[in-house]
Amino acid sequence: MKKFYNIEGMIRNGFKLSRDYETLDFSFAKFGDAAAESLAKARSIKQLRRLTISGKKLTAITAKAFGASETLGNLESLKLYKNKIGDEGLKYFAESSKLPNLKSLRLSWNNIGPQGIKHVANSTNFQNLTTLVLSENHIGDEGLGYFAEAKSLENLESLDLRNNKLTDQGAIALSKSKNFPKLQLIDLTGNALTAIGFDALAEMKIFNLIRA
């Protein structure tokens, strides 16, 4: 892949715009997988806690680079809306032990399907995750069935599943899970659930169950 040369300059400008050394948002910059690979190796981001890169067609290459990074260990929030991370990219995040402080992972509009969710369910690296946003993907009932079996999401508090081709079948599978003791919010807007699915989820005693 073509080497990206100006990442340190972009980082400096990004920190100036955010007015601190813990937040970067490259959503309004020219930024692709090559830039992400360079960012993941930059020494000047060791204190970074919040990173946003949306709408840049980033692929699994970016996820692989971030997952292997030796300098993103303090990252708490990663927002990658409207990219092309896909199932393969989610696999890299799920298998990474280099992001131990990650609390919020937001992957709306990233072409994620059931296999991507299976990687999440099998992961042991999401113990600190409190917010997971997967809206506008296509995980379906199969994916939600996998998700219900997740063993390392015991601290998850907020789950966004808007517009994911879900039906009562997936909702019932999730409702039977005992793996989310701290879950307080589920957003299921834009799915094909009926009262049957919502009644099942109500048994989980979710504080905020968004239906529409």
Where are these regions (language model features)?
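Eukaryotic endosomal/vacuolar membrane-trafficking regulators centered on PX-domain-mediated PI3P pathways
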Residues: 2-5, 17-19, 124, 188, ...
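Conserved hydrophobic beta-strand positions in leucine-rich repeat
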Residues: 22-26, 48-53, 75-80, 102-107, ...
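N-terminal alpha-helical scaffold/docking segments in eukaryotic complex subunits
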Residues: 17-19, 23-28, 42
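Leucine-rich solenoid repeat scaffolds
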Residues: 175-212
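Consensus "Asn ladder" position of solenoid repeat domains
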Residues: 29, 56, 83, 110, ...
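Leucine-rich repeat
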Residues: 6-15, 32-41, 59-68, 86-95, ...
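Inter-repeat linker/turn residues at the boundaries of leucine-rich repeats
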Residues: 19, 43-46, 70-73, 97-100, ...
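Eukaryotic tandem repeat interaction scaffolds
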Residues: 88-89, 97, 102-158
